[in-house]
Amino acid sequence: MNKRGTALVRAAIVWMVFSLVPLFAVAQEGHPMSGSWVGDWGVGATNRNRVVVILEWTGAEITGVINPGPNAIPIKSATVDPSDWSLQFEAQGPDAQGKMVAWKVEGTIDDLGTYNRTLAGSWNVGNTQGDFSITRQ
């Protein structure tokens, strides 16, 4: 093969590699629930609490934490229904007075086809019932 032929082959290979890179990037997104979710929960429009939820699909189950850091609350159990993309998870954490109580969160994912999809529904901490809305970052 002459120099011109070798250069054309190299150019074709480079073009193929760079044209396939976006396909690999899209394929790496993973499970629709996996990722960092940021938003708030609370009772009414003025009593809101900022919340960060980290969710991960392990291939067998959804795991995660609420408000990661030194006082993170691990999610004990989580289920997702792919027919309507509803999610339920439970945890054990402190209420407003610091007493350990059950946390129960139920929501439905919106904008499934977008990267910054939202999850919204009910957020219960002990006897306190509220709502939440979080967006994947």
Task: Please give the residue ranges for each predicted region.
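Sec/Tat signal peptide C-region and signal peptidase I cleavage site
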Residues: 23-27
